[in-house]
Every structure is written in structure tokens, then in C-alpha cells.
A protein has these predicted regions:
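Short beta-strand segments
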Residues: 15, 71-75, 140, 246
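Single conserved hydrophobic/aromatic residue that forms the stacking wall/gate
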Residues: 1-10
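Short beta-strand elements in bilobed, periplasmic/extracellular small-molecule ligand-binding domains
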Residues: 11, 33-47, 161-163
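Glycine-rich phosphate-binding loop
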Residues: 66-76, 80-84, 177-210
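Anion-binding alpha/beta catalytic cores of soluble intermediary-metabolism enzymes, centered on
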Residues: 72-132
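Glycine-rich phosphate/diphosphate-binding loop of Rossmann-like nucleotide-binding domains
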Residues: 16-30, 112-201, 214-222
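Rossmann-fold NAD(P)-binding glycine/threonine-rich loop
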Residues: 85-90, 94, 99, 103, ...
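Short, well-structured alpha-helical segments in soluble
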Residues: 53-65
């Protein structure tokens, strides 16, 4: 238990409004904290909370010595500038790994907090014995949260990396070169077997509800399953690894 360490890791979670998906994620993170012995405090703020009020709360937590990690649940209401809020969090308490300082450290190969979903994917590949070095790695999606840090981490592991996106010409031609395909495109079951090279490793970052209200990802699992050598399911694939890496960042914040 973390409580047996010299310092107690207290992680503060801030949620503005009542976005249903955000509430599920916050609940899962709260359970994970309790399981490993991290003390966590939730701030559930009203939808009408102003940007200035949120900045003031974060600044207060930045200067609270016993708080080692601060997490602001995204997305935020439209009237709040997410970039400003992310920049307000102290880089040393930015356990999500979104602050520009930590993003810069990642690209420079320096030590810092790494965005949790990409970090979890790297650990998943390593644990599964999948070689990254020298492999053709294609990331579909260029978001600051998944796509860009994913590319940086794959480069760090000596993968040959291509980042595809909505403006990529002939996406299927690009993805069919991939030994490792990371789908973070944000479209329900978009990636079918025709996008996949025989024997490719497929990592599905998406999380959606299909027409039957079942959870599914960016990859059409049933269509791709027989073509891939390994594939992550939704749910139960990338999601748990994301939370595990968040817990790892929290522990690191307390130790540092």
C-alpha cells in the first residue's frame, strides 16, 4: 500500500459538469486509487463554474504540499479553455502528462510524466512479447492525448513510425503496411479487415456505443480478429492499462 511509504500520495480529481462518460472514468479511477492505497479527493463542480474559478482551485492545489497529483477530467464545458487549464497545473503534479513541459520532455527523451494511454499501450506490447524495434508502426490519429505522444513513444522504442489522419491520402494503403497498428481515429468500427495486413498487431483505443448500445471501439473486432496476430478488445483492452499508468504516475509524483 502507498500509505506505508514515507509520503502519502494524495491525488485530486476535478470534474466540471456531469458528462456521463467522464463520470464513468472518474469512478474507475477512484476505485483504482482505493485499491492500491492512494488517498484521492474529488471536486465535482457545477457546469456553470467559470474558468477563473477553476484556475483558482488548481493554483491552490499546486501550492498544497500534501497533494502530489492533480487530474482535471476532460472534456470541459465549452466556455472553459482546456489548454489554459492544462497549462495551469504544475508540471510536477501533472499526472495525466498533458502539460507542454511534460510533452516536451517526452519528445526530447527526458524523464517526465507521459500521457497514460500511450504509456499503457507500450507496456501492453512489451508484456505480450511484441517487438517494436524495426517494425512498421502506424498510428491513426494525431491528438495531443493519444496520437502524438504514441508516435513519440514508438520512436523511443525504435519503431518506424507513420502518423495517419483525416487528410491522409489512401489510408488503407498506409495501414496495410503496418506491423503494429494503433487505431485512435474516433469513429465506431471504422477499421475493418481490409485496412489490416495479415498477421498485424492491432491496438484499439476507441470507446463508443454501437446501434445495440454495446461498447465497441474504432476497430471492427469480429471482422479483424482472424486477420490479426494479436488484437485488443473493447472494453478490457487499452482502458485498464490507461488507469494502471495513471496510478504509476501518481506513485512517481509522491516519490519525487
Amino acid at each position: 500500500s502507498i500509505r506505508r511509504q514515507r509520503q502519502m500520495c494524495i491525488r485530486d480529481r476535478i470534474q466540471v459538469g456531469q458528462d456521463a462518460a467522464s463520470s464513468v472514468y472518474v469512478n474507475n479511477k477512484k476505485k483504482a486509487c482505493a485499491y492500491i492505497g492512494i488517498d484521492s479527493v474529488s471536486y465535482e463542480l457545477k457546469e456553470a463554474t467559470t474558468e477563473a474559478e477553476l484556475v483558482e482551485l488548481i493554483e491552490k492545489l499546486n501550492h498544497t504540499e500534501k497533494v502530489h497529483g492533480i487530474l482535471v477530467q476532460l472534456p470541459l464545458p465549452a466556455h472553459i479553455d482546456e489548454d489554459r487549464i492544462i497549462r495551469t497545473i504544475s508540471p510536477d503534479k501533472d499526472v495525466d502528462g498533458f502539460h507542454p513541459v511534460n510533452v516536451g520532455r517526452l519528445w526530447l527523451g527526458e524523464t517526465g510524466f507521459v500521457s497514460c494511454t500511450p504509456a499503457g499501450i507500450i507496456q501492453l506490447l512489451k508484456y505480450s512479447g511484441i517487438e517494436i524495434a524495426g517494425k512498421e508502426c502506424v498510428v491513426i490519429g494525431r491528438s495531443n492525448i493519444v496520437g502524438k505522444p504514441m508516435a513519440a513513444l514508438l520512436l523511443r522504442e525504435n519503431g518506424t513510425v507513420t502518423v495517419a489522419h483525416s487528410r491522409t491520402a489512401d489510408l488503407k494503403e498506409v495501414t496495410r503496411r503496418a506491423d503494429i497498428l494503433i487505431a485512435a481515429v474516433g469513429q465506431t468500427k471504422m477499421i475493418t479487415a481490409e485496412y489490416i495486413k495479415e498477421g498485424a498487431v492491432v491496438i484499439d483505443v476507441g470507446m463508443h456505443r454501437d446501434a445495440q448500445n454495446h461498447l465497441c471501439g474504432d476497430v471492427d473486432f469480429e471482422d479483424v480478429y482472424s486477420r490479426a496476430s494479436a488484437i485488443t478488445p473493447v472494453p478490457g483492452g487499452v482502458g485498464p492499462m490507461t488507469i494502471a499508468m495513471l496510478m504509476n504516475n501518481c506513485v512517481q509524483a509522491a516519490r519525487d
